Amino acid sequence: MQISSLQYSCLISFIVFIGSTYIVLTSQNINLFGQTDTEVEQPMVNDTRLQIQEYSSGFKFPTGMNFLGPDDILVIEKNTGVVKEIKNGTVIGTVLDVNVANVSERGLLGIAISDKPRYVFLFYTETDKIDGGKILGNRLYRYEYDNGKLVNPKLLLDLPTIPGPSHNGGVLKMGPDKKSVYLVIGNLNYVQNETFITKAQNNKDGPPPDGRGGVLRITLDGGVVDNKGILGDESPLNKYYAYGLRNSFGIGFDSLTGNLWETENGRSTDDEINLALPGFNSGWREVIGFSKDTPEFNPENLETFGGKGTYREPEFIWRDTIAPTSVLFMHTDNFGSKYKDNLFIGSVKNGTIFNFPLDKTRTHLALTGPLSDKKADTNHETASITFGRNFGIITDLELGPDGNLYVLANYKHDGTIFKISAKQGTN
């Protein structure tokens, strides 16, 4: 069945967060939340030295998680605006319940936790009185954790919600310096209206950036990092770390170099992995995928913000869409040298986790064989980079304080956290 770019965008919205019955991903019909246990393949990893445990479950459309401490996790739910605390795999309570818009990709979308001082950062589409009420904004708040509750909210960013309702992104990560917060936000599904297509979407004659279509970074208090913007001094341009993004659900930092890596969802093909250095331009709306595959691409049409922004080709693409989500670097010895410091990517299609080693410079992926051209032309070509599959709709990957891999996914009838660890005596 052929689907248009607009149809595909809408379908991915349902796939990732809504869980609509019998929706289409490429040509396959998938009943995501009407399955019986016998109809769902069990999660598996290719390495027989590793094991999978269902750590916790019962969440409603979870979109992110973060560790407060050993065996102490905060999980956010997209549609309810609820933040739950889990200790030793058991939900012990709700630490916060905020009012959110929850149509399509709006909702409670991102969480990050700083160490010193201990703050919890949340990104969500806020409404006035009830879930689904009057929309106030896409907002980044800072909270304090106190005795099982999140208190003392401080508004750090207030961003547009239109045109919407998809491509909100929302993933948060603490910077390598532990003193900054990074947020990825898409273009909010722009329409063919120049008002909504800003310079951050490579519209050189468009209006100034308004906070959409990029990676933003701020201090723990909401200020400009180092008191100087990468691309310019005007607000909110001074908060942009990267731009030219269409629709991303994943950012993560290389634990060895501090470099930021990002996943990008294509319109109907060419999902990307990008190395996002400061001032990175992902190329949207002029190009997605490799520029050589876009005959009409002209680099002169790219916005550079006076030479401060730089377009960079993707480090990898999937021709057949897989809807990449979470980005994680395996900074642990638990699984052995085979995986240590590799790049792991979660995805929607088949609930697959991909594993990529990096080259010696750690600015490129170490790809061989049919993947040496930096692209997967068929699903068969991805066998060598597949770590595990059948996890459902993966929304987050996190390393626990114990060095094990935790996978947050919409699996079967609800949200589940899986724990992947080495079998005793195998590492």
Indicate residue ranges for each PLM-predicted region.
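N-terminal Sec-pathway targeting helices
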Residues: 1-13
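Hydrophobic alpha-helical segments and their boundary regions
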Residues: 8-9, 96, 392
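Hydrophobic membrane-insertion alpha-helices, especially the h-region
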Residues: 11-22
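Acidic, Gly/Ser/Thr-rich repeat motifs that build Ca2+-stabilized beta-propeller blades
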Residues: 22-25, 29-191, 250-253, 259-266, ...
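Beta-propeller domain segments
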Residues: 32-45, 106-108, 177, 187-384, ...
